[in-house]
Every structure is written in C-alpha cells, then in structure tokens.
C-alpha cells in the first residue's frame, strides 16, 4: 500500500515522464484580488490561459501539487470540517496542464494510465462523465463526442460497456467557465464506486454520495464565451486537471490497496493526518477514534465524549495545516479580509482544543510534526517554522483570555434563555472578538438557536457606519473601463507631449487617458504624481492619476471652458521636485526592508507599504522591535545613504531571476515574462546590490539624494504585524524640528510650574526648588548632520534634559503638597484642640482653608476617637468644601455622615457622599456657610 508521500511523488513522476515540467506550488496569497486564498490548482496558470504570459516550458506542459484553502467567500468548507470524512479548509490539488500543446486524447489516456495501470484502480469501479448540454435550457457548447469516444475506447479495452461506464453530465457539473465571458470548455470527471459490491452501474455518480467519489476532473478549455452568449473556438486549446490529493490517499489506503471495500474511506484515516493525531494524543492524553455523526447531522450528543473528541481532533489537525501554511506564505491572522478568516480559523481550533483539555497554547506544539510530513515538498514551511510557532503562540495566548471571558458571558446570558439574541451575538463579536461561527458553535453545543436576522442587521448597520466614516474627497476611477493602452515615459522624462485617447466625466472630474504619460499612477503603495496638463494653451492641475487596465487616467477638475476630446494634443508635466521626494522615500523603503531583514529577521515579511513625498510607511510581520534594533536599522540605512550608492533599474527575464533568493519577491505577487529589478549598489548588471527587489515604482539615481533617514515611530497595528513610519531629507529635518519645538514647550510648562511652586514655598518661608538648565538642545548643525548617530545623540541628550525638567516640576509639586499637608496638619491639630477643649457632644465649625485642611480635620477626629457628630466647612478663595464625621455614639443615635453631606449639599445645589462614619462634599462658592452649618445643626440635633 502506498504512503501519501509516495502517491504524491508517483503523480509528479508520472507526468515528468510525459515531458511535463514539475513546478512549485504557488503561494496561498492569490494573484487575483477577487480571491481570499489560492483555492484551485489552476489559479497560478490563469495568465497562460488568457494569453497574457507565454509558458516558459518546452513543451508547454506543467504538473504540480498546489496548496489550496477554501474558507470564506464563495468556496467555504469551514463549518463542515470535522463533521464528515472529506471536508477540509486546507488541501492539496494535484494537477497536470497543457497550454496549447496536447488535448483530450492524451489527457484522458494518461489519466487512465496512471489510475488504472500504475496505481491499480479496478477499471470496473470507474465511471467517467462527459458534457451533454440540454439545448432546451440554452446550455452552451455541444455534446463532447470526442471525450466520449476516447473514454469508450479505454473501457472497451477492459471488456466494459461504455454506455454503462460513461455518464452524461449537465452544465452545472461538466462545463467550466472562468467568468461570464472568456475561456471555457467542457469537463470530464472520473468517479470511483466505493460500495462493497462495486456494481452500482453509475447510479451514484454526481448524487452527492460518499460511496461514489469524484477523484479527477479534466477540463478542456476550447471555447471563448462572447458577450452575446455565443461560443467562439479558441485558436489554441488547453488542458486543466485537478485531483484531490487527500481524496486519492483515502481511496487507496482505506481500501488497503483496493483489496477491501468493506468500510467507507475517510481522508482522516490516512497517513496525511495520522502523524498529527499521534502528536495530539501525546499532548492531550486522549485517543482518536475515526467516528462521525449521522450523515447530514451537525448536532452532536453532548454525552458522546468519543464523538466530541473525534470531531475536535479533525478540526484541530485541519486548521493547524491551514494556519501553518498560510503563515509560512506571509498571511497572518488579523482583522480584515483573508487575515480575519485565518483568525476565525485559529479561534475555532482553540475552542475545539478545549474539548481535548487544552487551556494553554498548544497549536505550536504540532508544527514540527507538520514540517516532518510536508517540509520537503513545501520548503517554505520548514524555512519559516519558527515564525509559524511564534505567531500561533501569540494569537492563541491572546484569544485564550478572550475565550474564557466570552464563555462566562455566554453561560450567564443563556442560563435561562432558549435562544441567543442577535444583540448578544453582536456584542460578543464587536466587543470580545468572537466570530459568529464560534458563537454558533457554542449555541449548537447547548441546543440553542441564534437570531441571525437581527445579528446580520446589526452587522450591516456597523458596516454602513464604517463606510460613512471612510468617505473621502479622493477621486477614484472605479466605474471606468477601457481597452486603451498608455505608455509610461516617467522613468526617463518629467514631461512629454501626448495624444488624448479617451475622455470620461464623473461628477466634477474629467478622466483624460492619453497614449503616453510621464505621470506615475497610484499603485504598489506609491502615490500618484501631481503636475500640469496643458490643453489648448491653458494649464490645468492634475489632481490624481489612476491606473485603469493598461491605461492611465489623469484626473482634472471639470472647469467651465475646459474642452478636450480624443485626438487632441496635450502637454503633460509632472511636479518634478515632488517626484524626487517621492523617489527618495521609495528607495529608502527598499533600504529599510533590507535593514529589517539584517537586523530583525529574514522572516520580517512585508505586509504593506505607503510612499509619498513627505513620509513612508512599512508594515511587516514580526514581534516587537527593540529600541536598540531601531537605532541599528537607522544606522544601516543612513550608512548606505552616505556611501552614495547608485540605484540601477533593469528589466530581466523572470525565468532568469525568479529563483534568486537575494532578490525580494512577495508572496502572492505574479510576474510577467519580463520583470523590473531595482538594485541599490553593485554593478548595473551584476545582481550584487545591497538591496534588490522586483518593483515597478520610481526611484532616485543615487542614495546620496535621499538625505537623512529618520524613523518617526514603530508599533503594532495588529497581532504579529508591526508598522514603521519614517521620513527622509527635508521632511525628516522638519519632523525633528517639530519634535524639538514640542519638547521645548514641555520645558516651558515645567519651568512655569516650578516657578508657581516656588512662589508658594517662599510664602511659607521654605527653601525653593532650583530651576534646571537646558542641556543638549540640538542646533542647526546637529539637525543638518548626515551622521544619524550625531543626530540621535543630540536628540537623546535633549530628550533626557526635557525629562529632567518634567521630573523636577513633579518633585516640586510633591514638595509643595507635603509642605501644605504639614501646615494643614499643624493647623488642624490646633483647631481641634481649641474646638474640643470642653468636650462637646457635637461639633459644627467653619474654618478658612482648602481640601488638605478639611481632610486633616477629619483624620484628627478619627485619631482622637471622637464619639459625637461633627460637620465642618472649609472656605478658601475658590471653593466651599463640606466634611462630616460620626463617631460611635452618633452612629448609635442613627446619624450617618454620608446622609448628612448629601442632604446639606443638596440644599445649596452641591453634591457629595461617603460612608456612615466619614464623608465629604462641596457646595457652590457663593453658598452661605452659616446657612449650611445651621442645616447641619438641625440634622444633628434631630
């Protein structure tokens, strides 16, 4: 019986023998912006099918095993994982591909050869489907007679009746389309009868039966769907096939090499998952049993511990694969889009981990086992295993606290309820980060329903608020479409003449597309150029530039008198000074990326960037960056700037450089046959620079033109994602100047506070606090220094001086407070000695003083164990403060200090309160102290 590793390798070796090039799996970060994750083997090959790229292989054939995720979006298997034997969020798709080379005969013949002749599938258990359109329903294309004939020949060779073993399929199951228009064609699927008898004669094909499983889908791309609904034959036909790896392993291993069909195959009962289960058994002390709920049931008896634990084993193993491969490809758990899907998956795994007794992070303990099984096939997993563990530990630890709190709230909320309200489900999501599917899981475990209609309504209201908050005045060419092509000349020139190709109006803006332009469009994190467009002798400001397909639209205000039409000649000129500042920040971003790899970690992968004329922003995955690391990063970047390194921008054949680990390439990015390499330092054609990246942006010619590089801030923007903001040149100097000005204001405030304190200390006859002197305030020489160490040392001395001023001011205030307290204590002691000299049973007094005196008076009464009731008023220039005290005798008589304060303060429109023995309050400054004292006397005397 073949192992999973042997099955995968056998597939790839078979097609290598058929002159296919074995290509690596694409990243799980998809090329298409419409996809959350790479979800099919064909994703990375779409540009070849569309004719955008030329296949680099001779012959034009490829084979691979592709990492895929189906969770979130249109294809979402998340909720089914664990409850049956075949759903996964992560899976491998084995495939072979032909780009205008071979077609149906070879694809079908080779599929049969591999499955039947090499792997030994019983031919009598196989059923092929071919496309048979229902013309009465307007189905596209024609009956796939070619595929039928090829399959028939193979079945007959084994003495089998083609009319039994070839099943006609409808447009839903057997016709593939890339979109409403574009490449498309019929499919032919291969199904396996897994019933014990194996004689269903095709009756279970496409009937959603787990006893007749599709193992391979062959797609024949031969048409182009036109906008009028017609089908045009393509000049070159393609083959796109996909075989579920886990499914193939299940069929071969669970039947013991096709010898025993007595039990239903399960993807989880294979050596794809067994190593993870073994490790989980060790960690949890529980045993995995390959048992499942009744078909179609999502309700699991809470008393059935074995089944509960089996589901948990499967969920954790599946989700661990999804999380680990995604993180290795640079996709991290987060709060938006695919990142939030990953966070949901992780939190679901953690919740199921509780069923196995895990209350502390445990997922990272499974990573080494996963690497042992898959690290050779997917080397990126092994290379980034440490990062994967760090991210899992961090996310899991964070969510465990949330989960504990959420479970408490859920149990309290649902203790006496028969349903989970939409408001509560939304609160768990919005306040505590509970994904709705996790709340649904908790409800399911307790047999409760959720008011999803109300939850969805609250979610939509939140989205509406978010959309309203995001509205801006920035013009976007969202609704424009064009087939025009604009040549970008901005790498070489700052201005050029051009011909208008198209003009569109949206609101108060004109979108002018020209045949060429020096204007860079907003993309790749770089802002668009600004400048002027001269039309008919008049110049107009270009507000923005948008990329629309292969064209660039210049956004201009539609002013009265502005007339422009296709064919007009115009002159375009960018704001060159602004462009140079943008270029400086862009090149500095590349240097920052390089420095991060050297100082922090080679796994500090880019998660996003923004480059403008006055700042740069760079997001990357990492744990916290220390101050020492930040200083070293600054020194490295400024060191490269001081070296006056040339910046080379060259075009290269992608095939020549795609494997060069020294060139930064980004997960999920797809490149054409020719790529632009931006190299800082080294020889122009040597690929030996200190920094090398694929980049289509604009850059300076030499690092000396960057000027000073200074980091403004570094911090977390999401779990595991950090952000550095930095500035270069004049923008950096202005940032430092503003910092010095702001800190100087802090010094001025501190000095003013020290002087105020000293005035009072002088009045008290006490020693005053010395005012420090400013040391290290950066002058123009320091601010203009190119040596970042000089700048940072000067700033550090100045910042330390600022902190010294602020601390001196705090110490001065403490000294004054202590002095006041000492005076107040002495005064209070003297007053109480006077007031209590004849041992009165009650005490009502008015004194001049502030809050310190009132508190010392109350403290003194307590210290003297005064047994009666007291009401005290302290009056100064800015306040009227009230205090009440009740000793043991007064309390025994039913008096309460808190009640007394509340009642008396209310008479004057004030407020207050406290305990029965001691309370404080205040009244408006214009209140009559004697009237309040009289009111208190009435309360005390009853």
From Swiss-Prot:
GO terms (BP aspect): alanyl-tRNA aminoacylation
Binding site for Zn(2+): 586, 590, 695, 699
Details of cofactor binding: Binds 1 zinc ion per subunit.
Organism domain of life: Bacteria
CC per GO annotation: cytoplasm
Gene3D superfamilies in UniProt: 2.40.30.130, 3.10.310.40, Bira Bifunctional Protein, Domain 2 (3.30.930.10), Threonyl-trna Synthetase, Chain A, domain 2 (3.30.980.10)
Domain observations: Consists of three domains; the N-terminal catalytic domain, the editing domain and the C-terminal C-Ala domain. The editing domain removes incorrectly charged amino acids, while the C-Ala domain, along with tRNA(Ala), serves as a bridge to cooperatively bring together the editing and aminoacylation centers thus stimulating deacylation of misacylated tRNAs.
Family label: Belongs to the class-II aminoacyl-tRNA synthetase family.
Protein name: Alanine--tRNA ligase
């Amino acid at each position: 019986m073949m192992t999973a590793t042997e099955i995968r390798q056998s597939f790839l070796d078979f097609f290598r023998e058929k002159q296919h090039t074995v290509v690596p799996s694409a990243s799980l970060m998809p090329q298409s912006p419409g996809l959350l994750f790479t979800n099919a083997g064909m994703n990375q090959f779409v540009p070849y099918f569309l004719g955008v790229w030329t296949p680099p292989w001779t012959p034009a054939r490829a084979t691979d095993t592709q990492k895929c995720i189906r969770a979130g979006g249109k294809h979402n298997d998340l909720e089914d994982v664990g409850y049956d034997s075949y759903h996964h969020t992560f899976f491998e798709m084995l495939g072979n591909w032909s780009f205008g080379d071979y077609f149906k005969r070879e694809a079908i013949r080779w599929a049969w050869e591999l499955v039947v002749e090499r792997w030994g599938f019983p031919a009598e258990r196989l059923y092929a489907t071919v496309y048979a359109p229902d013309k009465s329903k307007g189905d596209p294309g024609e009956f796939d007679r070619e595929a039928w004939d090829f399959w028939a020949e193979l079945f007959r060779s084994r003495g089998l009746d083609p009319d039994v073993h070839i099943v006609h399929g409808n447009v839903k199951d057997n016709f593939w389309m890339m979109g409403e228009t574009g490449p498309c064609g019929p499919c032919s699927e291969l199904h396996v009868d897994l019933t014990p008898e194996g004689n269903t004669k095709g009756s279970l094909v496409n009937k959603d039966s787990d006893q007749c499983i599709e193992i391979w889908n062959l797609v024949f791309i031969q048409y182009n769907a036109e906008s009028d609904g017609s089908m045009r034959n393509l000049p070159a036909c393609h083959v796109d096939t996909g075989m579920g790896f886990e499914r193939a392993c299940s069929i071969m291993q669970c039947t013991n090499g096709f010898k025993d069909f007595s039990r239903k195959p399960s993807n989880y009962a294979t050596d794809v998952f067994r190593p993870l289960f073994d490790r989980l058994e060790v960690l949890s002390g529980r045993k995995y049993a390959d048992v499942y709920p009744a078909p179609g049931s999502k309700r699991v008896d809470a008393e059935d511990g074995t089944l509960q634990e089996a589901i948990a084993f499967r969920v954790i193993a599946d989700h661990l694969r999804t999380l680990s491969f995604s993180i290795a490809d640079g996709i991290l758990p987060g709060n938006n889009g695919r990142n939030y899907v990953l966070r949901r998956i992780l939190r679901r795994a953690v919740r199921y981990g509780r069923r196995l007794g895990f209350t502390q992070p445990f997922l990272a303990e499974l990573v080494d086992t996963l690497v042992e099984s898959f690290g050779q096939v997917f080397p990126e997993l092994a290379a980034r295993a440490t990062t994967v563990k760090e991210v899992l530990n961090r996310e899991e630890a964070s969510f465990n606290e949330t989960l504990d709190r959420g479970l408490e709230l859920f149990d309290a909320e649902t203790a006496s309820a028969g349903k989970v309200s939409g408001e509560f489900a939304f609160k768990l999501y919005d306040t505590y980060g509970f994904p709705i599917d996790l709340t649904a899981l908790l409800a399911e475990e307790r047999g409760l329903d959720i008011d999803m209609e109300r939850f969805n309504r609250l979610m939509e209201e939140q989205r509406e608020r978010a959309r309203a908050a995001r509205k801006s005045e920035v013009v976007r060419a969202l609704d424009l479409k064009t087939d025009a092509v604009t040549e970008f000349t901005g790498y070489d020139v700052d201005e050029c003449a051009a011909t208008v190709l198209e003009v569109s109006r949206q609101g108060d803006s004109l979108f002018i597309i020209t045949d060429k332009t020096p204007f860079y469009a907003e993309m790749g994190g770089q802002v668009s150029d600004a400048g002027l467009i001269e039309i008919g002798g008049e110049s107009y400001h270009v507000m923005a530039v948008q990329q629309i397909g292969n064209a660039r639209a210049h956004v201009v205000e539609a002013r009265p008198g502005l007339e422009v039409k296709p064919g007009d000649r115009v002159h375009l000129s960018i704001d060159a000074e602004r462009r140079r500042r943008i270029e400086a920040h862009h090149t500095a971003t590349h240097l920052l990326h390089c420095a991060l790899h050297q100082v922090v970690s080679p796994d500090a992968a880019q998660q996003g960037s923004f480059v403008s004329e006055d700042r740069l922003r760079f997001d990357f995955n990492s744990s916290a960056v220390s101050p020492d690391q930040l200083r070293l990063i600054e020194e490295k970047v400024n060191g490269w700037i001081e070296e006056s390194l040339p910046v080379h921008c060259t075009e290269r054949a992608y095939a020549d450089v795609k494997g060069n680990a020294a060139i930064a390439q980004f997960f999920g990015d797809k490149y054409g046959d020719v790529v632009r390499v931006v190299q800082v330092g080294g020889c122009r054609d040597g690929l030996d620079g200190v920094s090398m990246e694929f980049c289509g942006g604009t850059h300076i010619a030499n690092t000396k033109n960057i000027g000073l590089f200074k980091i403004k801030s570094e911090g977390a923007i999401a779990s595991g994602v950090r952000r550095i903001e930095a500035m270069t040149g004049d923008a950096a100097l202005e940032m430092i100047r503003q910092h010095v000005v702001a800190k100087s204001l802090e010094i001025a405030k501190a000095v003013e506070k020290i002087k105020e304190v000293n005035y009072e200390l002088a009045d008290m006859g006490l020693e005053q606090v010395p005012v420090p002197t400013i040391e290290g305030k950066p002058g123009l020489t320091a601010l203009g220094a190119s040596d970042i160490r000089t700048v940072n040392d000067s700033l550090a001395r100045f910042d330390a001086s600022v902190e010294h001023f602020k601390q001196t001011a705090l110490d001065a205030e403490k000294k004054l407070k202590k002095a006041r307290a000492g005076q107040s204590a002495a005064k209070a002691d003297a007053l109480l000695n006077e007031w209590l000299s004849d041992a009165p049973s009650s005490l009502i007094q008015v004194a001049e003083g502030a809050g310190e005196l009132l508190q010392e008076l109350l403290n003194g009464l307590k210290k003297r164990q005064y047994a009666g009731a007291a009401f005290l008023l302290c009056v100064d220039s800015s306040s009227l403060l009230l205090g009440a005290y009740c000793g043991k005798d007064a309390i025994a008589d039913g008096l309460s200090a808190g009640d007394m304060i509340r009642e008396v303060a209310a008479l004057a429109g004030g407020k207050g309160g406290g305990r029965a023995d001691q309370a404080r309050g205040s009244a408006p400054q214009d209140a009559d102290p004697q009237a309040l004292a009289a009111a208190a006397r009435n309360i005390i005397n009853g």
